[in-house]
């Protein structure tokens, strides 16, 4: 008996040994790890157009400075995952970072590398396709750890119009309409974020800042607006509050349960309302349906809503449910997307019930049934109406998608176009690009046979209708950020101080009132365009509003290509998100440029010089003192053996250029040696420049990337800058005479072809402040600029006077020239320069009376050495000798 028990015990021990050994090894492995990465959340929610901080912290399992600790900086990698695809967002090690081009200017590590335990990621300007899983991975030596979190971007922008007519809302009416349907009027940032996520709508609509815009992914003749040939958000600028347009609404949180009521006999609108009330709910609003769709609701069944419209949400498109695009589909009576079905027609109904636990996102689409006819998408031919040149406005017709509805609630059943491949989610859809509808499609839309209408609307459980509210063109087939990766220093990773995606403009008198979205907003008509004003539009004068000039993302600069895996950085400096970058000048030489008073009164930027530098020598504790630059206010850091030295711009002093020696006048703002004042009053370019000159300034010149970021972020409007080619076509010069040291043109700009008069330059602030040339008679806001340090009137001399008209202020480095009065001869240098301390150089010119006969002797007597004529004097004229 005892041997049997011993054998059983031995067998039990041998059976348990592998598992126990594995547990011991696992514990040993866990204890042997140097650190563990934790995010601390399973799901995070962000708001469309907003910013989201994704936490990620490193927890050390043994002292970080122990003998076994790896030297150098840990390697941090953030990855975006969607389905079976992975996209690298950024990789950082110390002060070096590599950022995916699709995330450039949108991601930052606010604490790293100052804190090696906080590698949290900040993702700004959230888009719909930013929803997915984000993984944080940290590697240090041979140790690595990672954690992941799901991110959901909530919020949806949609076009809304009542069934009666297209373009029927004033600005106040638009706000009320969005509130009536359980939403609010969208902001420019939200519309732009939706556009970046693939949204397209060829219908002009109000936004919260009283501007009128519409997003276009695929430029086409009828939807070109003020950005002919380029994708982007078309913009009319601020228009009159009584003008009539559609409205873009924004819905975000559902805060309850939305469910489909589908009785066998269907319901009229009044019966649908009572149906919901009997179940302790109310008939859902349009905004609530959009919010539920954004949360995952997928129902291929048209149902009544509170505003009398009939709609249904589609997440997974199919051939029988409206084609290959996800979105909320709407049934219209007419091909121009107007007319809701009669309230006596019978449909299902969408009800909404307040609940602490919304369940709309868990709704699933109904199963497919065979033999069902498809919902027809009827398109109307696109048109473009152009006004004559004096009007500078035109009207565009939107792409039309609607379903003719019969009196019994049925719709057409013509064969739909071949659908694109059905994606799994709205953010993964890849569809055929929308092309302008043809004549045949329009004729099909008005010739639907009565017997081909729907017989049973329950068949709509597998059928969908397209409203072209969410368009994923072939060019944007992949919602995942892709593209080349560039490497930057960490100071370049953080997003700029400006919110790049803001589109607003301050209220001011708007452009001429023209109803309908313009196809060529504020642009002269092309050859062959009509010469009469189309009906429904009033003739307007030459004074125009502010267009948006491009929606094409700015091309990024390529950086170095060294790998992050090469080892830790040797530049341990604290990094944090920064705004405009510091101006750096690699030398101390003075500018050799000469500015005459007749052509310029300002030269920006003023480069640091020996005389301008009020800074001393600061001793630094280690090498790499100038990375990042310790100098403030645009000062230049120079490394020296004993430390570093800051060369200050005029107006600043101190060891680190942090002491202000001069200050701007009240109402002006200082930045890196210049003063700026913004005017929201809209003027033509010439009027704006004249107004600036009356203040002793000029329209702003942009000479550095830092100045570009400051002006664009500080004054978020379309605005004039001083660049123009009014003198010679194609030769762009700054109005203040500053050298052309920096350019930030929009792709394809400047494009003033055929002498169209686009001779002045506007800064389009929401496109990272990129520039476009436009006609000078546009009325835009503007910013004036003058030097922080300037000189007053030049010294007056009794026998000499300056060239040009006197001015009250002269910028640093401005050079004036004296000339002697008639009958006097000049001696010594006639030039004086405005110095960095705001004082003129002492004049050295002297004027003496001319000696009699001087002019004759200058023509006859040799002036140079050895009897040679001076190089700059003409040879005496001798009459030809006779042969």
UniProtKB/Swiss-Prot annotation:
Keyword list, A-Z: Disulfide bond, EGF-like domain, Extracellular matrix, Glycoprotein, Hyaluronic acid, Immunoglobulin domain, Lectin, Phosphoprotein, Proteoglycan, Repeat, Secreted, Signal, Sushi
Protein location: Secreted, Extracellular space, Extracellular matrix; Secreted
Gene3D superfamilies according to UniProt: Complement Module, domain 1, Immunoglobulins, Laminin, Mannose-Binding Protein A, subunit A
Modified residues (Phosphoserine): 224, 413
Domain of life (superkingdom): Eukaryota
Entry PTM: O-glycosylated; contains chondroitin sulfate.
The Ig-like V-type domain, residue ranges: 35-154
InterPro entries on file: C-type_lectin-like, C-type_lectin-like/link_sf, C-type_lectin_CS, CTDL_fold, EGF-like_Ca-bd_dom, EGF-like_dom, Hyaluronan_bind_Proteoglycan, Ig-like_dom
Keyword match Signal: yes
All residue ranges annotated as the Link domain in the record: 156-251, 256-353
PROSITE patterns, A to Z: C_TYPE_LECTIN_1, C_TYPE_LECTIN_2, EGF_1, EGF_2, EGF_3, IG_LIKE, IG_MHC, LINK_1
Tissues showing expression: Expressed in the retina, specifically around the inner and outer segments of photoreceptors, retinal pigment epithelium, outer plexiform layer, and the ganglion cell layer (at protein level). Brain. Expressed in the brainstem and cerebellum in a perineuronal net pattern.
C-type lectin domain mapped to chain residues: 658-786
An MF annotation (GO) of this entry: carbohydrate binding
Residues making up the signal peptide according to the UniProt record: 1-22
SS bond list: 56-136, 178-249, 202-223, 276-351, 300-321, 626-637, 631-646, 648-657, 664-675, 692-784, 760-776, 791-834, 820-847
Biased segments, Polar residues type: 479-495
Primary location group: secreted
Residue ranges of every copy of the Sushi domain listed in the record: 789-849
Region (Disordered): 402-592, 854-883
Comp. bias (Acidic residues): 440-451, 459-468
GO cellular component, one term: extracellular matrix
Domain EGF-like: 622-658
Family label: Belongs to the aggrecan/versican proteoglycan family.
Function: May play a role in the terminally differentiating and the adult nervous system during postnatal development. Could stabilize interactions between hyaluronan (HA) and brain proteoglycans.
Name recorded for this polypeptide: Brevican core protein
Organism: Mus musculus
């Amino acid at each position: 008996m005892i041997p049997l028990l011993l054998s059983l015990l031995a067998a039990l021990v041998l059976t348990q040994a592998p598992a126990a050994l594995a547990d011991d090894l696992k514990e040993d492995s866990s204890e042997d790890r140097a650190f563990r990465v934790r995010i601390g959340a399973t799901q995070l929610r962000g708001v469309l157009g907003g910013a989201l901080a994704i936490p990620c912290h490193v927890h050390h399992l043994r002292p970080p400075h122990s003998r076994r600790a790896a030297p150098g900086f840990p390697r941090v990698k953030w990855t975006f995952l969607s389905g079976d695809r992975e996209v690298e967002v950024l990789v950082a090690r110390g002060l070096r970072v590599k950022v995916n081009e699709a995330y450039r200017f949108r991601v930052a590590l606010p604490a790293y590398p100052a804190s090696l335990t906080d590698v949290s990621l900040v993702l700004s300007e959230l888009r719909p396709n930013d929803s997915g899983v984000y993984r944080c991975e940290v590697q240090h030596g041979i140790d690595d750890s990672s954690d992941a979190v799901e991110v959901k971007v909530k919020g949806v922008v949609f076009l809304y119009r009542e069934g009666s007519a297209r373009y029927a809302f004033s600005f106040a009416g638009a706000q009320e309409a969005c509130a009536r349907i359980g939403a609010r009027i969208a902001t420019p940032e939200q519309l732009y974020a939706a556009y970046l996520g693939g949204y397209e709508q060829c219908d002009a609509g109000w936004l919260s800042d009283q501007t009128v815009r519409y997003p276009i992914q695929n430029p086409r003749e009828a939807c070109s607006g003020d950005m002919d040939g380029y994708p982007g958000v078309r913009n009319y600028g601020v228009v009159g509050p009584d003008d009539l347009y559609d409205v873009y609404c924004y819905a975000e949180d559902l805060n309850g349960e939305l469910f489909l009521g589908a009785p066998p006999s269907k319901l009229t609108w009044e019966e649908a309302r009572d149906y919901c009330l009997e179940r302790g709910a109310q008939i859902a609003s349009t905004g609530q349906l959009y919010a539920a769709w954004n949360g995952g609701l997928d129902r291929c069944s048209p149902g009544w809503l509170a505003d009398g419209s009939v709609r249904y949400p589609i997440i997974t498109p199919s051939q029988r449910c409206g084609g290959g695009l996800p979105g909320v589909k709407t049934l219209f009576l007419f091909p121009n997307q107007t007319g809701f079905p009669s309230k006596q027609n019978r449909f299902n109904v969408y009800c909404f019930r307040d609940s602490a636990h919304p369940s709309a996102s868990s709704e699933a689409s109904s199963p497919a049934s065979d033999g069902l006819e498809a919902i027809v998408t009827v398109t109307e031919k696109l048109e473009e109406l152009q006004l004559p040149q004096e009007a500078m406005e035109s009207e565009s017709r939107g792409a039309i998608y609607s379903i003719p509805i019969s009196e019994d609630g049925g719709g057409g059943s013509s064969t739909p176009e071949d659908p694109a491949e059905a994606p799994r989610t709205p953010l993964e859809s890849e569809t055929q690009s929308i092309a302008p509808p043809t004549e045949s499609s329009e004729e099909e839309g008005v010739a639907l046979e009565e017997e081909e209408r729907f017989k049973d609307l329950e068949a709509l459980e597998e059928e969908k209708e397209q409203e072209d509210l969410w368009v994923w063109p072939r060019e944007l087939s992949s919602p995942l950020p892709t593209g080349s990766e560039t490497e930057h220093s960490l100071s370049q990773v953080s997003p700029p101080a400006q919110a790049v995606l803001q589109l607003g403009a301050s209220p001011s008198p708007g452009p001429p009132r023209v109803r309908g979205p313009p196809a060529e907003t504020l642009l002269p008509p092309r050859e062959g365009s009509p010469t009469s004003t189309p009906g429904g539009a009033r003739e307007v004068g030459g004074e125009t509003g502010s267009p948006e000039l491009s929606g094409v993302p700015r091309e990024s600069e390529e950086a170095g290509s060294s790998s992050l895996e090469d080892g830790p950085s040797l530049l341990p400096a604290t990094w944090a998100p920064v705004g405009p970058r510091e101006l750096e000048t690699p030398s101390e030489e003075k500018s050799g440029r000469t500015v005459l008073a007749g052509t310029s009164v300002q030269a920006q930027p003023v480069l640091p010089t020996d005389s301008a530098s009020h800074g001393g020598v600061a001793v630094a504790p280690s090498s790499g003192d100038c990375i990042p630059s310790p100098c403030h206010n645009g000062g230049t850091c120079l490394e020296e053996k004993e430390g570093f030295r800051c060369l200050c711009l005029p107006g600043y002093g101190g060891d680190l250029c942090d002491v202000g020696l001069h200050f701007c006048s009240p109402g002006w703002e200082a930045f890196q040696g210049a003063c700026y004042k913004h005017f929201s009053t809209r003027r033509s370019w010439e009027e704006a420049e004249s107004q600036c000159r009356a203040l002793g300034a000029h329209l702003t010149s942009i000479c550095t990337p830092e100045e570009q970021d400051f002006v664009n972020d500080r004054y978020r409007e379309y605005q004039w800058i001083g660049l123009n080619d009014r003198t010679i076509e194609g030769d762009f010069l700054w109005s203040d005479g500053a050298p052309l040291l920096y350019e930030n043109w929009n792709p394809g700009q400047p494009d003033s072809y055929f002498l169209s008069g686009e001779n002045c330059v506007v800064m389009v602030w929401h496109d990272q402040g990129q520039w476009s040339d436009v006609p000078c008679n546009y009325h835009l806001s503007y910013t004036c600029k003058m030097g922080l340090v300037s000189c007053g009137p030049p010294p007056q001399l009794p026998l000499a006077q300056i060239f040009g008209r006197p001015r009250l202020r002269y910028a640093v480095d401005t050079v004036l020239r004296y000339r002697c009065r008639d009958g006097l001869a000049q001696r010594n240098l006639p030039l004086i320069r405005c110095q960095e301390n705001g004082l003129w150089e002492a004049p050295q010119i002297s004027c003496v009376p001319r000696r009699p006969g001087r002019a004759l002797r200058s023509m006859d007597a040799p002036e140079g050495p050895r009897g040679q004529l001076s190089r700059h004097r003409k040879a005496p004229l001798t009459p030809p000798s006779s042969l």
